[in-house]
């Protein structure tokens, strides 16, 4: 450091000490004036004395605190001027730091990013309404298998006959082993005969069911009343008369020719 700088610092600190002394003298004079104001005509009270003693103690504590802070500031300025590193106490740093309102609060949640958000309540409701197997409340549509008399590749009779042919061919290809006996052959023949009889019975039952359906239709026709039959005949005659346009035109031409003659 230069001599000029050292001189300025010493002079600055001397001025600060002089200012402190003057402030202390001014405070003492003010306290004396207060005492004179309260002690008029030589009257004094013990309570006032106690209050004054407490005020003096508090004022002395405040003065000591102010001096302590002032010395700390002066030491800090000295360390900064000398360029030396000095540890700063935590209390001074805490006093100089700003309030927490400027800083981020840890209690606040982090900002939300633009992501897909599923409506979980709606999903749970849909899962509750759904069932493992969807039930159909509508009535079943009647399905009648159409059996054509012609034996095509898709007809039922053709497929049954084809299946029987293949089964017979497989039975013939099976070779007889040494362990097979005559009794086994007889049992196989009996089983084949039983199968044939069952198939014949099924065919007869099927034919009977078809004939029964036709009989039912005939019975329904017979149950119709005579009034319905008469109404039907009238309707048929009116429909024929309405759609037989050729006859109507011919009759009109005949009438015109008669009028001209």
From Swiss-Prot:
Residues 1-16, 154-163, 226-250 have a biased composition (Basic and acidic residues). The keyword Cell inner membrane does not apply. GO terms for molecular function: protein phosphatase binding; protein phosphatase inhibitor activity. Residues 17-60, 212-225 have a biased composition (Acidic residues). The keyword Nucleotide-binding does not apply. Residues 1-150 are annotated as: Required for binding to pppB. Signal peptide: none annotated. Keywords: Coiled coil, Protein phosphatase inhibitor. Residues 123-134 have a biased composition (Polar residues). One of its GO terms (biological process) is intracellular signal transduction. Interacts with pppB. This is Protein phosphatase inhibitor 2.
């Amino acid at each position: 450091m230069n001599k000029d700088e050292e001189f300025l610092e010493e002079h600055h600190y001397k001025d600060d000490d002089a200012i402190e002394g003057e402030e202390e003298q001014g405070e003492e004079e003010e306290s004396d004036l207060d005492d004179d104001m309260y002690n008029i005509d030589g009257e004094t009270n013990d309570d006032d004395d106690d209050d004054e003693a407490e005020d003096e103690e508090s004022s002395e504590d405040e003065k000591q605190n102010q001096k302590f802070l002032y010395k700390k500031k002066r030491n800090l300025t000295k360390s900064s001027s000398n360029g030396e590193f000095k540890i700063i106490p935590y209390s001074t740093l805490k006093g100089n730091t700003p309030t927490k309102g400027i800083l981020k609060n840890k209690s606040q949640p982090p900002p939300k990013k633009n992501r897909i958000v599923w409506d979980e309540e709606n999903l749970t409701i849909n899962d509750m309404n759904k069932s493992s197997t969807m039930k159909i409340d509508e009535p079943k549509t009647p399905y009648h298998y159409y059996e054509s008399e012609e034996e095509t590749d898709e007809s039922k009779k053709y497929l049954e006959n084809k299946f029987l042919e293949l089964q017979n061919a497989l039975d013939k290809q099976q070779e007889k082993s040494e362990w097979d006996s005559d009794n086994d052959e007889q049992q196989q023949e009996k089983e084949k005969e039983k199968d044939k009889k069952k198939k014949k019975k099924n065919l007869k039952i099927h034919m009977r069911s078809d004939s029964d359906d036709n009989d039912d239709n005939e019975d329904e026709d017979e149950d119709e009343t005579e009034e319905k039959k008469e109404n039907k005949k009238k309707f048929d005659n009116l429909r024929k008369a309405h759609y037989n346009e050729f006859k109507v035109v011919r009759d009109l031409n005949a009438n015109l020719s008669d009028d001209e003659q």
